[in-house]
Amino acid sequence: MSVLQVLHYPDERLRTIATPVETVDAEIRRIIDDMFETMYAEEGIGLAATQVDIHQRIVVIDVSETRNERLVLINPELLEKSGETGIEEGCLSIPEQRALVPRAEKVKIKALDYNGRPFELQADDLLAICIQHEMDHLIGKLFVDYLSPLKRQRIRQKVEKLDKQKARTK
């Protein structure tokens, strides 16, 4: 397994619409394993393949405090959503920035698991929010897209400044 490079906003590759996974094979499972390693190394709770420049419909999530409840979503589809909620969301592709984003309180999805088996899942609370956030990545949408142009511009400037500072220290 290896840690993959996470793309940072405003990288245009984050706007790529992911394509469905045709076959869940050893290569897809290797990508999933690398995505989990990357997500844990970056201290995230979710990661979409788009964020690591792999443009296939793959999401990994672990919202547990113990970091041992891995959820794999291959070709996820939203079946139902209800209620309204929102929290200050962060994103590995938008480091050190947070903003309140409106989301559905509950979702029902269908997807394929790590072995390519279909399943359905009903989720609420943080898991529902995380699923919606990561599924947005698969269609090239970021949490900043829910914000005003002014807030989006400020976040972009902060992220670009952070990236320049990190580049100087390498």
From Swiss-Prot:
Q: What EC number is given for this enzyme?
A: 3.5.1.88
**GO MF annotation terms:** metal ion binding; peptide deformylase activity
Pfam families named in the record? Pep_deformylase
Top-rank taxon? Bacteria
Entry note: cofactor: Binds 1 Fe(2+) ion.
The cofactor(s) it depends on are: Fe(2+)
**Catalytic site:** E134
**Positions that bind Fe cation:** C91, H133, H137
Q: Where are the transmembrane segments?
A: none
Kindly give the InterPro entries that the UniProt entry links to this protein: Peptide_deformylase, Peptide_deformylase_sf
Give the reactions, separated by semicolons, that this protein catalyses: N-terminal N-formyl-L-methionyl-[peptide] + H2O = N-terminal L-methionyl-[peptide] + formate
The task this protein performs is described as:
Removes the formyl group from the N-terminal Met of newly synthesized proteins. Requires at least a dipeptide for an efficient rate of reaction. N-terminal L-methionine is a prerequisite for activity but the enzyme has broad specificity at other positions.
Write down the NCBIfam families for this protein, in alphabetical order.
pept_deformyl, PRK00150.1-3
Member of which family?
Answer: Belongs to the polypeptide deformylase family.
Please state what the protein is called. Peptide deformylase
Record the organism: Photorhabdus laumondii subsp. laumondii (strain DSM 15139 / CIP 105565 / TT01)
